[in-house]
Regions:
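N-terminal secretory signal peptides that target proteins for export/translocation
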Residues: 1-3
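Intrinsically disordered, low-complexity regulatory segments enriched
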Residues: 5-6, 279
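Bacterial N-terminal signal peptides
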Residues: 6-16
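Transmembrane beta-barrel domains of Gram-negative outer membranes and organellar outer membranes
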Residues: 21-282
Length: 282
């Protein structure tokens, strides 16, 4: 099945927003929100080498461009998020037998599709104080926009619930995520795979507007890979990079190093984030 989602672009007057609420090039989620009435737009690209898809059996180099996200500040403590992408292209280097490899419907060495859209809500539960970190929760649902016929998607709906913690110590921002993921089985509609999701990131300001950042982020499948539903296995990756903020615009870049045999051996990412005033909360 093939589905497409078009994002609507919005324009308004620039204003500042909490820098801690902007993650790129990292994916570990900060508990701080972007602020009431603000809109955050981010866009960029990823290039990941030697990534493996266990459901389709494809292995190759993945280009995602653009990777986009929109966040809406619903109040001072709540934020609504939409994340996805318009074009994912996999250059296939190797094919292996897999549960859904017989469903592949493309020829040649390249296959492409859209990115699965993620719809999420983030709520800051506790504000940060000198003696206490900020705490929040995030609930996210991944929609099945990418098709299994193209070998990139799984045609499953996945749900994540995470606890978010963040603390600034002098010039260093520490953020941690921990939660549960409920992932659909692409081969059976009556089965799911439960995983433990986690992330830990560090951002250090080295001069005005400039930060160096790094993280470890992934998910852990407590069951053996042979027993777990395909596509719900353990994943993990490290990201390192930097970002520069000027007024309400931030540019970023980083490298990606996979920590399992299914993750990319190496990758790069770069993008831009813009926060502006979008609407007034009554």
């Amino acid at each position: 099945m093939r589905r497409r989602l078009a994002f609507v672009s919005m324009m308004a007057v620039l204003i500042a927003a909490p820098a801690g609420a902007q993650q790129r090039p990292l994916v570990t989620e900060d508990p701080e929100t972007i602020g009431s009435g603000n809109i955050l737009f981010e866009g960029g690209f990823d290039l990941q080498k030697e990534i493996f898809y266990p459901v389709s059996g494809l292995e190759g180099d993945l280009l995602r461009v653009p990777v986009v996200g929109l966040s809406f500040g619903l109040s001072s403590i709540a934020e609504f998020q939409l994340d996805g992408g318009f074009y994912n292209r996999l250059h296939v280097n190797h094919r292996s037998p897999a549960p859904l490899s017989s469903m592949l419907d493309f020829t040649g060495e390249n296959t492409s599709d859209v990115e699965d859209v993620v719809v999420a809500t983030k709520i800051r539960v506790l504000s940060e104080t000198p003696g206490r970190p900020a705490m929040g929760v995030r609930f996210a649902t991944k929609l099945p926009n990418a098709s299994n016929e193209n070998g990139i998607g799984t045609d499953t709906t996945d749900f994540y619930a995470s606890l978010l913690i963040g603390k600034t110590v002098q010039s260093v921002r520490l953020v941690g995520n921990a939660g549960l993921g409920i992932l659909g089985d692409p081969t059976r509609g009556d089965r799911q795979g439960d995983v433990l999701a986690y992330g830990f990131s560090v951002a250090r300001a080295v001069r005005q507007g400039l930060e160096v950042v790094g993280e470890i982020n992934g998910r852990y499948q407590p069951n053996d890979d042979l027993e777990a539903p395909p596509g719900t296995d353990t994943r993990a990756a490290m990201r390192f990079g930097g970002r520069f903020t000027h007024r309400t615009v931030r540019i970023d870049g980083g490298v990606i190093v996979g920590l399992t045999k299914r993750d990319p051996s190496f990758g790069i990412t770069a993008g831009v984030t813009w926060v502006f005033r979008g609407f007034t909360i009554p």
